[in-house]
């Protein structure tokens, strides 16, 4: 769908869709999840904003899909056969997790496309589903002077957790927590912590 979308869009046109993507078991699903989407977008004349709102391991993902597609009404043997088939397929593909979220695209005109599409990847939002103006702002901020004029602010519910080895002046682990919304917790480096706190 994403690869074919630009041919159906006028310059400046947008596409917003829910999406799921497989994350290889060799990658951290919280910090290295965007490679698959990057491959989908490679060479397309679009700017993209991608948000991963949730991550499930293959077993939980399979259970969710079977349950949502009538699993409770299935005979036990049919359920187990479907469940096993999905898990075997994920194992063969080397899938360690499945990311779920949304993708927003804006079709570039010829001049913009010549310089290549811009992409922004986010782990989650501040607890609300993006509306049209959110998507328009996010995609517009990827281009030209707007990018340098963008002022990033920390949501008021974000808190930092620090873990120290007793007697050590520097933290061994930093975790940012979202107090509201989806309640995400994300391990971060000291550089990311400094930027968020600035």
PLM feature spans:
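Substrate-binding/catalytic lobe of Class I Rossmann-like enzymes that use SAM or dcSAM, i.e.
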Residues: 16-129
């Amino acid at each position: 769908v994403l690869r074919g979308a630009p041919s159906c869009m006028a310059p400046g046109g947008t596409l917003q869709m829910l999406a799921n993507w497989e994350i290889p078991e060799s990658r951290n699903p919280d910090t290295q999840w965007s490679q698959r989407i990057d491959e989908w977008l490679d060479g397309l004349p679009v700017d993209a904003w991608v948000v991963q709102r949730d991550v499930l391991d293959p077993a939980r993902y399979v259970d969710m899909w079977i349950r949502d597609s009538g699993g409770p009404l299935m005979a036990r043997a049919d359920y187990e056969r479907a469940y096993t088939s999905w898990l075997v397929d994920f194992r063969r593909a080397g899938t360690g997790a499945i990311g779920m979220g949304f993708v927003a695209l804006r079709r570039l005109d010829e001049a913009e496309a010549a310089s290549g599409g811009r992409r922004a990847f986010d782990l989650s939002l501040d607890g609300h589903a993006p509306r049209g103006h959110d998507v328009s702002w996010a995609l517009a901020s990827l281009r030209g002077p707007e990018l340098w004029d963008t002022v990033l602010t920390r949501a008021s519910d974000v808190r930092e957790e620090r873990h120290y080895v007793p007697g050590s002046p520097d933290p061994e682990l930093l975790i940012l927590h979202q107090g509201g919304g989806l309640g995400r917790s994300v391990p971060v480096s000291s550089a990311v912590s400094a930027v968020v706190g600035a």
